């Protein structure tokens, strides 16, 4: 994996590899230990609270993705879809480790062996270093008091998110490929061109990157 360097930052989009493809982060493609987002912003300070609420005071995101996110939610609001909330953005590896360990522990409490608990946890929580949230380009978008999937807001995002460079990262019909169960709230910024192409082909990010690398 060849990542964006400081010398190339003016020509390669944020969150892309040197060949211009969106950065793929999963269990098989973990981020390098020294990976750092380029320009994180505190979303509570940065975002207009009349458009979206931020759950907690420390949620951050890569600025280019946050700008696109705000523009997208402003459009949704203009169409009568409100009550947006961001419940997760950038996560450090240490915090992701805690989330994963907590999930493993909960399964162990249900009687699973260590191996069984880790296997079950991986389907719901990415292992440290393997989470898209480390990039600052992924956000959990919710509506307070709902399970989000099936809401008008969720349906609108799935239909229109590509227009602002986002993809629904873990759709229900791609679980066998992504290795993650359906997450209707998890959206990843990949840029408009890539998002539009994935919408046209019906590919998830794993399929898209594999195809582009083989061309």
Map each language-model feature to its residues.
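Extracytoplasmic cell-surface/polysaccharide-interacting catalytic and binding patches
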Residues: 1-215
């Amino acid at each position: 994996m060849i990542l964006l360097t400081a010398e190339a930052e003016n020509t390669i989009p944020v969150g892309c590899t040197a060949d211009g493809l969106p950065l793929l982060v999963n269990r098989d493609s973990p981020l390098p230990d020294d990976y750092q987002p380029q320009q994180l912003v505190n979303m509570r300070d940065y975002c207009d609270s009349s458009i979206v609420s931020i759950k907690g005071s420390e949620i951050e995101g890569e600025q280019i993705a946050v700008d696109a996110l705000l523009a997208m939610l402003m459009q949704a609001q203009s169409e009568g879809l409100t009550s947006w909330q961001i419940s997760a953005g950038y996560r450090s590896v240490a915090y992701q480790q805690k989330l994963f360990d907590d999930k493993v522990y909960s399964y162990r409490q249900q009687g699973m062996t260590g191996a069984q608990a880790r296997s079950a946890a991986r389907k719901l929580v990415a292992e440290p270093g393997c989470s898209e949230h480390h990039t600052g380009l992924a956000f959990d978008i919710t509506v307070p008091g709902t399970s989000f999937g099936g809401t008008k807001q969720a349906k609108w995002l799935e239909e229109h998110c590509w227009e602002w460079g986002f993809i629904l990262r873990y759709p229900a019909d791609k679980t066998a490929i992504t290795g993650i169960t359906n997450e209707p709230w998890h959206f990843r910024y990949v840029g408009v061109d890539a998002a539009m192409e994935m919408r046209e082909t019906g590919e998830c990010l794993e399929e898209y990157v594999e195809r582009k690398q083989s061309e």
